[in-house]
């Protein structure tokens, strides 16, 4: 290694050349090898072993004469590569330790490094700077004094050298002081820390991994003489290190001295990472590093290039471009922003509360401050996606009438999800300043203050909000490196003619923020219109969704109030929700329907409870069914269906209450001859008693809730008491059994038990069990009332009649008159329209014919007779629905009501109460208590309920059988409105 190589190693930018001969250079190289071997064994041979920083400052002049050739040269490259640890050679250690001893050791290591890494010294010009040369004599005396302490030096140097083995030395300098275009300084700056190679790829003298970055401040300014003092360079180097350790930092506090790599990292953390970004910027400016700016492009074993070496020794002239201290600029920005008045970035009355994190730049009161945030919208909704023509719209009509309505692939979201979609960006729309007139376009959204997350008008996602600090000052500190990294490039781009401007104390380096309203931009108009169209579309979607929910609830209420088949209510609701694309679930209980509307967007559900008093209104049931079919087949919208449903619900009944009272008496008179064998006289009595029952039900019970709870018991008591009283009149031919049963026929629980049996048959266990049990208890109430009324009159009148059968029945041919009359009467009581009467009468008469003749053939078989009649009724009703598109339920119910009294009359179950009453009277009048009425009383009380169950089971089996024949695969588009 020659002198020129050592000069390049220390970053010397001079144009001088080595004037020595090759023989001299070879001799110096061999001398350096011998001297280094002696230095490794004995530290006393080092003339600078005890030289301290203070001694250098006091005894060495910047221009003192010194013979650089007297110092030994480092070993050759071949020796260092073959034996890296030759003669105890070790790297210096700069690990900080506490106390003066540690500082002295660091200084001694630095001086030894000068000795180990330096080449032949040259004697500088003593008069170059014009200072006193007498300091050289004092320096020589100090050297002689230091030689006398060889013993102590050897004791200290040996362990010290051992501790330096394996340590890395880094002479850190400011990267800004190195000109990347300098062919001499740039290779030194590009040398990677820890590689142990110089710019030519040769191994260093120690053979270990080390990074030696030499700082030569004067070489970048101008070309100097070849007699530059290198000892003065290291003197300044050590002075910077000592000044930097002071608390105030000194004048050269911005510069960095010789320190360890650990301390260098600590300083980078104190500066907020500015050193790291400066290194990244400098690496980008240096050699082409590709996509890894943190790694230097250094070849460990490049080939020697003579032309490159000659270029590196050339003199480079030019002025340094004084760079801006970006850290100080960033700190100044933070300081200036923090010193703004409170009203500049805070509201007097803060509008940014919990849940309201948006701000509108169009109003000064909502300007962004340190505490203002911009909340991210929901990621699962995109306004651009709503208006795309390629996707299906929520308002697209459902495909027309189909034979089958499968479960929808996509259902409409709930109201809550739609509201969230509509209002999630409500404040974002405020960021567009509203136009002051109709012809103005919305203004461009203003960008928040110094916030890179909000660039290009974008709103940060929820993940980026986690990194937003709580104040603008801390946010600026966090982004100071990014701001500083682009400051120099922006200044160079916009002001290429500026050179050597003052960076400190100048407000020109601070960015200016115009306090003006942004200009309007026409390019945001389509986006604004698009967003307004999306909001309008969501509004229409919400309105339509509410209409569909309301239609389902209105439909459910109408079906329950007007007597739809309870075992098919859930099926009707499911079909309706499928057609309307509503995620609905339904659970029916007697008198109550639980409706749940699901919302897949928010994973929530809206539960509605529909409760109403179940009744029977055949005409309104027909109207509700007509509306249902039109909506399901998509010939009517849900909003139009709601209008019609409201009209149906608000309409008055076709038959008023007082007419129903008279019809009650008429039906009682009509049912007495053909069902219970009464004669013509019994018709008048049954009419009178039936009218009383109708008055109790339609007038008294409707006005008193308390009485409605005991209506059945009170009516049975009154009918039994009055009927036995009329039957006890001598010679009147009034039949007690026919009058009593005919008057109570309209309040028999036939329909209730029928609905319960149908529900149980259709696997609706909850509703069917409840209704069936209620029907049994209801029958027991009636039986108890008949018994109590008959017993009361028997106690009052000793000669009360006990006859249960009429001795004078009417001819059976008159039944062809009474059955249609009873059908018309019961249909009018149940609010049937006159256009429905012909079908009802036809089906009812057909059913009774089957009952009459089957009863003649199968005696004492109530279940079988009712089953055959119900089967025929079901066949005719379902054919009417399938062929003539009518409502099967309304046509079949009057015929079923005709079957129930006939079945009950065949068993004479109502008169079991009379037998119980007679037993009670006989028991009280008997002395000695021989009678045992327990068994007969128990059988008489339960016989009526058992008879009702038998009739209902027979009707249920017949109805299901008829539905299976007419609709073997069921109705697919709509539910089967049949019993």
Swiss-Prot record:
Main location: membrane
InterPro entries assigned: ThrE-like_N (IPR010619), ThrE/Ser_Exporter (IPR051361), ThrE_2 (IPR024528)
Compositional bias segments (type: Polar residues): 77-86, 192-213, 503-515
Sequence ranges of Acidic residues compositional bias: 54-68, 122-135, 379-395
One GO MF term: transmembrane transporter activity
Its membrane topology: Multi-pass membrane protein
Bias kind Basic and acidic residues: ranges: 15-26, 105-115, 138-148, 158-175, 253-263
Keywords recorded for this protein, A-Z: Membrane, Transmembrane, Transmembrane helix
GO CC list: membrane
Comp. bias intervals (Low complexity): 29-38, 360-372
Pfam family, one: ThrE_2
Record region (Disordered): 1-279, 295-318, 337-411, 432-451, 491-528
Transmembrane segments: 658-678, 680-700, 710-730, 734-754, 773-793, 809-829, 832-852, 864-884, 886-906, 946-966
Cellular compartments annotated: Membrane
Coiled coil: none
Basic residues composition-biased segments: 516-528
Family: Belongs to the ThrE exporter (TC 2.A.79) family.
UniProt name for this protein: Pheromone-regulated membrane protein 10
């Amino acid at each position: 290694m020659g002198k020129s190589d050592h000069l390049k190693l220390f970053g010397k930018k001079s144009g001088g050349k080595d004037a020595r001969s090759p023989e001299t250079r070879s001799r110096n190289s061999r001398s350096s090898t011998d001297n280094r071997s002696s230095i490794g064994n004995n530290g006393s041979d080092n003339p600078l072993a005890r030289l301290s920083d203070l001694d250098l400052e006091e005894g060495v002049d910047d221009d003192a004469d010194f013979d650089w050739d007297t110092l030994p040269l480092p070993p050759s490259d071949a020796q260092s590569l073959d034996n890296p640890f030759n003669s105890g050679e070790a790297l210096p250690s700069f690990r900080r330790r506490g106390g003066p001893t540690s500082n002295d050791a660091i200084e001694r290591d630095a001086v030894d490094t000068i000795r180990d890494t330096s080449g032949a010294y040259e004697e500088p010009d003593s008069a170059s700077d014009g200072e006193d040369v007498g300091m050289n004599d004092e320096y020589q005396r100090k050297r002689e004094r230091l030689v006398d302490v060889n013993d102590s030096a050897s004791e200290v140097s040996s362990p010290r050298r051992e501790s330096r083995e394996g340590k890395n030395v880094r002479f850190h300098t400011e990267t800004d002081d190195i000109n990347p275009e300098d062919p001499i300084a740039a290779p030194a700056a590009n040398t990677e820390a820890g590689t142990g190679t110089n710019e030519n790829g040769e191994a260093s003298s120690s053979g270990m991994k080390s990074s030696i970055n030499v700082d030569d401040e004067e070489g970048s300014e101008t070309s100097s003489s070849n007699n530059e003092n290198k000892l003065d360079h290291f003197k300044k180097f050590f002075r910077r290190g000592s000044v930097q350790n002071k608390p105030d930092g000194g004048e050269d506090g911005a510069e960095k001295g010789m320190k360890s790599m650990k301390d260098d990292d600590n300083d980078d953390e104190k500066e907020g990472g500015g050193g790291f970004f400066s290194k990244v910027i400098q690496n980008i400016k240096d050699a082409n590093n590709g996509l890894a700016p943190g790694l230097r492009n250094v070849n460990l074993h490049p080939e020697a290039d003579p032309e490159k070496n000659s270029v590196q020794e050339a003199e480079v002239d030019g002025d340094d471009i004084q760079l801006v201290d970006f850290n100080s600029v960033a700190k100044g920005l933070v300081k200036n922003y923090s010193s703004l008045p409170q009203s500049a970035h805070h509201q007097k009355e803060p509008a940014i509360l919990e849940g309201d994190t948006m701000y509108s730049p169009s109003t000064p009161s909502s300007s962004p401050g340190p505490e203002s945030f911009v909340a991210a919208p929901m990621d699962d909704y995109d306004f651009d996606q709503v208006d795309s023509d390629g996707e299906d719209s929520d308002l697209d009509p459902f495909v027309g009438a189909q034979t089958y309505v499968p479960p929808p692939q996509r259902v409409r979201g709930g109201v809550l999800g739609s509201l969230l979609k509509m209002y999630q960006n409500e404040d974002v729309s405020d960021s567009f300043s509203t136009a002051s007139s109709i012809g103005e376009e919305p203004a461009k959204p203003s960008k928040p203050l110094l916030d890179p997350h909000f660039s290009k008008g974008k709103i940060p996602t929820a993940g980026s909000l986690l990194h937003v600090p709580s104040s603008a000052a801390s946010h600026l500190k966090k982004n100071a490196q990014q701001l500083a990294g682009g400051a120099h490039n922006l200044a160079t781009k916009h002001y290429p003619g500026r050179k050597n401007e003052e960076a400190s104390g100048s407000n020109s380096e601070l960015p200016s923020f115009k306090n003006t309203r942004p200009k309007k931009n026409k390019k945001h108009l389509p986006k604004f219109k698009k967003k307004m169209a999306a909001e309008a579309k969501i509004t229409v979607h919400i309105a339509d969704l509410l209409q569909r929910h309301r239609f389902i609830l209105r439909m459910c209420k109408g079906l329950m109030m007007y007597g739809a088949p309870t075992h098919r209510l859930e099926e009707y609701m499911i079909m309706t929700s499928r057609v309307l694309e509503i995620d609905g679930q339904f659970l029916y209980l007697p008198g109550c329907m639980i409706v749940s509307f699901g919302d897949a967007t928010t994973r929530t559900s809206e539960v509605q409870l529909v409760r109403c008093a179940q009744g029977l209104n055949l005409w309104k049931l027909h109207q509700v069914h007509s509306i249902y079919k039109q909506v399901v087949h998509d010939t009517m919208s849900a909003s139009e269906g709601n209008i019609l449903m409201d009209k149906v619900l608000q309409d008055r009944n076709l038959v008023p209450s007082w007419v129903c009272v008279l019809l009650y008496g008429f039906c009682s008179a009509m049912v007495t001859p053909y069902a219970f064998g009464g004669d013509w006289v019994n018709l008048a009595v049954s009419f009178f008693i039936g009218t009383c029952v109708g008055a109790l039900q339609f007038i008294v019970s409707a006005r008193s809730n308390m009485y409605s709870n005991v209506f059945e018991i009170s009516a049975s008591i009154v009918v039994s008491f009055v009927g036995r009283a009329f039957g006890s009149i001598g010679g009147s031919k009034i039949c007690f059994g026919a009058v009593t049963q005919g008057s109570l026929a309209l309040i028999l629980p036939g329909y209730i038990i029928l609905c319960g049996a149908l529900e149980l048959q259709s696997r609706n266990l909850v509703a069917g069990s409840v209704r069936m049990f209620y029907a049994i208890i209801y029958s027991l109430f009636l039986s108890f009332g008949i018994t109590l009324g008959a017993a009361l009159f028997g106690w009052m009148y000793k000669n009360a009649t006990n006859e249960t059968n009429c001795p004078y029945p009417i001819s059976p041919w008159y039944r062809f008159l009474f059955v249609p009359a009873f059908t018309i009467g019961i249909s009018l009581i149940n609010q049937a329209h006159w256009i429905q009467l012909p079908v009802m009468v036809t089906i009812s008469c057909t059913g009774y014919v089957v009952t009459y003749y089957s009863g003649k053939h199968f005696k004492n078989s109530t279940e079988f007779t009712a089953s055959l009649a119900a089967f025929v009724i079901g066949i005719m009703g379902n054919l009417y629905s399938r062929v003539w598109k009518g409502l099967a339920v309304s046509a079949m119910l009057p015929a079923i009501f005709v079957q129930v009294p006939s079945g009950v009359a065949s068993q004479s179950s109502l008169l079991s109460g009379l037998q119980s009453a007679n037993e009670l009277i006989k028991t009280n009048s008997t002395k000695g208590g021989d009678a045992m009425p327990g068994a007969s009383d128990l059988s008489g009380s339960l016989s009526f309920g058992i008879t009702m169950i038998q009739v209902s089971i027979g009707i249920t089996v017949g109805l299901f059988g008829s539905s299976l024949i007419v609709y073997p695969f069921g109705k697919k588009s709509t539910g089967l409105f049949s019993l």
